[in-house]
Amino acid sequence: MDHEADAFRDLMTITRFVLNEQSKYPESRGDFTILLSNIVLGCKFVCSAVNKAGLAKLIGLAGDTNIQGEEQKKLDVLSNDVFVKALVSSGRTSVLVSEEDEEATFVESSKCGKYCVVFDPLDGSSNIDCGVSIGTIFGIYTMEHSDEPTTKDVLKPGNEMVAAGYCMYGSSCMLVLSTGTGVHGFTLDPSLGEFILTHPDIKIPKKGNIYSVNEGNAQNWDGPTTKYVERCKYPKDGSPAKSLRYVGSMVADVHRTLLYGGIFLYPADKKSPNGKLRVLYEVFPMAFLMEQAGGQAFTGKKRALDLVPKKIHERSPIFLGSYDDVEEIKALYAEEEKN
């Protein structure tokens, strides 16, 4: 982009966007804006580390082959450290739940704030070596009391989240965010170092022609999932078959589903009867975004955002995407329940 030639354009950065949203609420003190700024900073840091990872491993930048190689292997740990520090230093968080940490992190009272953040610092990190898109997923809750924070402050249904999003590190770095009033996508301009609004008010198509699932697990699926995937491949109503697209990185698969429509499935199976994806920092944020974009998210039993987790690393099956596509698999589960 020629920034001098396009200087007249009204570039909406993510900070300006959130400040504009904040101005709609006169009682707002800017706490959420500060918190989000720190999340954005974490995303920029991780994006830079991910982009250098393969190069550092191959040629050893500045001769630090061993150190860089070690960092490459532990990029998910590095990402976790970055986000924990960014969130604590914001002074706006009280409880942090990360995919990398067995226990929740409770922020000391001198730096404590009113928000609880659940996150997966680097989802799909096993794909780093082959250059596949990976990402950070996050969800934000508000503490409704001034008592000592506990895990109960995050063990709440997803419909109580105040914001959710993900940052995808791929051919471009894109942050997709919802604060409960629609879904917006921001792309990182490397020359500016700013996330610019490039995808305002994202709406998922009502029906799609893509399904996304790991068919390697097909022999272990339940009846409704098996029937649904068969319908996708061999429709009996004369409609064209759906195309299979599966990256194996949740952020990449959900991002494509959000933009192009279709359905993402990660069902329970005989090996993982409770599902594989974690409720708090994978299922809930993605379900929140899908609903805000006009889609649906279903667990096989209920609306995903109505789940009430009992443990911070609890797992669940998930079916999310275009409204009509999810409606179809819901009907198959309802049919099985009747029988």
Swiss-Prot record:
Q: Where is it located?
A: Cytoplasm
Needed cofactors, names only, are:
Mg(2+)
Record: residues binding Mg(2+) 1: 70, 99
Q: Which reaction does it catalyse?
A: beta-D-fructose 1,6-bisphosphate + H2O = beta-D-fructose 6-phosphate + phosphate
Q: Which domain of life is it from?
A: Eukaryota
**Binding residues for substrate:** 123-126, 214, 246, 266, 276
Q: What are the UniProt keywords, alphabetically?
A: Carbohydrate metabolism, Cytoplasm, Hydrolase, Magnesium, Metal-binding
The record lists Mg(2+) 2 as bound by 99, 120, 122
State any GO CC term.
cytoplasm
Q: Does the keyword Cytoplasm apply?
A: yes
Q: Which Enzyme Commission number(s) are listed?
A: 3.1.3.11
Show the Pfam families listed in the entry. FBPase (PF00316), FBPase_C (PF18913)
What the entry lists under PROSITE patterns is as follows: FBPASE (PS00124)
Q: A GO term (biological process) for this protein?
A: carbohydrate metabolic process
> What molecular function terms (GO) are annotated for this protein?
fructose 1,6-bisphosphate 1-phosphatase activity; metal ion binding
> What main location does UniProt list?
cytoplasm
Say yes or no: keyword Repressor present: no
The free-text note explaining how the cofactor binds reads: Binds 3 Mg(2+) ions per subunit.
> What family does this belong to?
Belongs to the FBPase class 1 family.
What else does UniProt say about it? In plants there are two FBPase isozymes: one in the cytosol and the other in the chloroplast.
Supply the name of the protein.
Fructose-1,6-bisphosphatase, cytosolic
